[in-house]
Every structure is written in C-alpha cells, then in structure tokens.
Amino acid sequence: MEITNIEIKNNKNIAHIVLDNDETIQIIGSFLYGNVYHLFLTKIVNDKKVLFSYKTKDFTEVIERAELKKYEKSDIIKLINLSGLYYFVIFSNNKFFCYSVEPFIELNFELIDNLSSKGHETNLHVKDFTIFYINDTFYALLFIENEQNEIETQIFASKEFKSEYKIIKNFGSLHLVDDTVNSLSSYYKDGLVYVLFDSKKHKNYSSKVMIFKYDEGTKFEILMLSSYSFLSNERNAFFIQGKQNNLFISSILSKENSSKTFLTLPKIISYEKGKFLKKPAKLILNRIISVNDFDFSSKLSSHSLLKIDADKPFKLSFNNTDSTMKILFFEQKFAVEKDKKTILILDTKKAVISLFILLDEDIVEIGINKGEEFVSFCFNQSNLDFDVEIVNDKAIKNFQIGSFKNE
C-alpha cells in the first residue's frame, strides 16, 4: 500500500512537513531522539485506520517510512511518554491496550479492563482520551459523550496499569465541543497539567488548551480554558517533547484551495515553568515592569493574569536591556510605542479585547481579538520590523489566551 507522501521544507527556525491533503490524516504524536524526529500519523485506507511511522534527520530528509498496523475506524490511538519511554495506547471495544514503540510489540496487559464496569449503567461513549503519569500514578483524562450529547471531562486514576481505575474528578460538561473533538494530548511538568485538543464547528477547526493545577491527593483544579487557534482551518495541534524535557506545540495547517497539508515544526524549542508556548516557540512575556505606572515588578510573575478594560486608558510597559516598550489603550485605539516612538496604532472601537503577548528572545508577538476580527502582529525589538495579520473568522470570536494565576 502506498504510504502518505511527505517532504520537508525549511525556513529559518521552522520546518514544514508537507503531506497529502487528506482530511482523514490524524497526527498521533511525535518525539525527538538525538537529531532524529519521529512522527506517527493515521489515515483512513479502505475503511481501516492505518498507523504510519516516519523518521526525519535534522528536519531535512525523510530517512524511514513504515506502515505499522491497521485498526478499526472507531479506535482511538495515542502516543504517550511514561518516565521517558514511549508507548502507543489504543482504545478499542471499550478497552485500553498498550504497545511499545520500538520495537512495535503488543504488551501483555490491558490498561483498563472495562470502563463500563466502573459504576456506569451503560458503556461510556469515549470521544477521546489522554494519559499522563505523576508520582507513580497513571491518570486517564477522558472526553465522554453523555446522554444529552454533551462532552464531559473525567479523570481516572490507577496506581498500576492492571489495577482498576477509579474516577477521581468529573468536571461535568464544560461546553467544549461543537461538532467533534480530536487530537487530545497532555503534558505534565512542575505541578501543572497542560491539555491540548481540537474541536470543529461548521468545518472550522479550533484548538483549545486547558491547564490544570495538580496537588497531592489527586486534586485537580482548572486554571485556564481558552482557544488557541489562529486560523479557522487549523487542526491537529499537539504536544511534542524534545531534548531535556523541552516542550513545543505543533499543528497541521490544512490550507484552503491547496492539494497539500502543512505540518509546522519549530526547530528551536524551549520551556520555562508556567509559560505556555505558541509556534514558533514564543513565550508569554514575563518582563512586565509596570501597568498604568504602578510597579508590579515585585508581585508579577509568569503566572499572573492581567485584566484590561478597553474603554479606559491603559498602558503596559516592559524593559529590554537599554530600551522600554509601551503598549497603550486610549480613545478606543491600541498602540505600541518604543523609546517614545509610536510604531503601530490600531482602531479597537468598543469591542471586547483579548490581549496576549508572547516573547522569544527579541521577537514579540501581540494578538488582539475584537468581535469577529482578530489582529496578530509580531516585531523584532532591535529593528522594529513587524508583520500584521488580520483574520476575519467567527470561529475565534471568543478567542482568549493568557497566563494564569498560581494562588
């Protein structure tokens, strides 16, 4: 059987893996091992879900392609990292099964014997799941469709693969889903669980992120739930774990009027506690020095949440070595100033605005959502070069992203 075509195009710090434009393609997961990038995906072939493996060297060439196994279309397949080792976890016929990645061998145990026997009168309709590992305990976060066709989020816990899972948290319906969900993935670090997933409405994809704070005693608290997608047709956002537990996020961008699908991969990756990453590996700003001339420097951290009122004058400043940049709201206008020089002004009217600032070294990106119009621009602090992108899309009308409080 012919394997999905794949080629790599490099552009500065970003590699684009180009695949066939097939709506059935799903990214299962990936990881870096040395200079070899491993990518796993499925596509529907002859009414079967087929798992493929790809390896690329230095993000420049494909060095291996393989078909691993065929599954039923309804089966859910995930790649998980448990204590540095990678496994495939398959949900089929209401049971979980586990395979080692290399070599591709089925392990002789079931993760969960039968979810329907855990106090539920009927079989659970699992839409998607992800598994993470904290302090010798396995946690399964499941998206389950209830009788009202709403998606509920439940967390199961188990000390061992073989032991019975028990529900430790049921968040109920979070009104997360429009038409469908997929690409649920998770990442745990320093007491925070990052969960990323896609939803789809009227053929528009929107990636969303949930952040949980974890405390001993299996206590989970939602810190943030917000949209992540910048483009209406963006899909398959997922976590990739790189060297030294670094983390970045990648997505398939299914371009309209194109025969190709693009998988965007940041090649320079970094991670710091409490900072949420966005392509290409930019970080939420943590060098804010003043808000409306009030000194927050001693209180503000990367976990802080800033709430602004677009109808009132607003000024945000941060330092960068020998210069100062200010972000201003005044008379329903948004402006960026550097060293007392205005470099950008946008009319915000009176719409509700969500503002986020992402930083990667000297590159700053700022996004504003006003009604159905989303404006994103980035520039280099050293030369003031910046790009502006305006996306008219109802799907991101309620776009919100930001850092979060750590009480």
Q: Where do the PLM segments sit?
A:
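Hydrophobic core segments of beta-strands in well-ordered, beta-rich domains
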Residues: Q26-I44, K78-N93, G119-E121, V126-Q148, ...
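General structural concept
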Residues: F40, F52-Y54, A66-E67, K73
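Beta-rich accessory regions
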Residues: M1-D22, I28-L32, K201-K203, K208, ...
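Surface loop/turn signatures of beta-propeller and other carbohydrate-active proteins
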Residues: M1-F31, F59-N81, F104-F132, S163-S186, ...
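Recognizes the extracellular SEMA beta-propeller fold with strongest preference
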Residues: F91-I105
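Hydrophobic residues embedded in beta-strands of well-ordered beta-sheets
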Residues: Y37, K49-L51, Y86, F96, ...
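A compositional/structural signature marking long, glycine- and acidic/polar-rich segments
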Residues: F143, E147-G242
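Beta-propeller blade signature
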Residues: S53-T56, C98-E102, E152-E160, S206-E216, ...
